[in-house]
Amino acid sequence: MEGSKRKHDSRRLQQEQEQLRPRTPPSYEEIAKYGHSFNVKRFTNEEMCLKNDYPRIISYNPPPK
């Protein structure tokens, strides 16, 4: 049990160190390896509202001329 606690603490310390380090832009090899995952970001409330509006905007048909 004591060993598992120690492992958890070291993992948390590693995450804190990663947050402190400035993020470098991904190299071409990393982009080729991981693809779109670099562009994935957390949604803010505003972005979520915009995302929810898309189906209504797309389904809107302009009146025929």
UniProtKB/Swiss-Prot annotation:
Transmembrane segments: none annotated. It holds the Pfam family Orthopox_F8. The keyword Cell division does not apply. Belongs to the orthopoxvirus OPG052 family. This is Protein OPG052. InterPro entries: Poxvirus_F8. Residues 1-10 have a biased composition (Basic residues). It comes from Vaccinia virus (strain Western Reserve) (VACV). It comes from the Viruses. Residues 11-21 have a biased composition (Basic and acidic residues). The keyword Metal-binding does not apply. Induction: Expressed in the early phase of the viral replicative cycle. Keywords: Early protein.
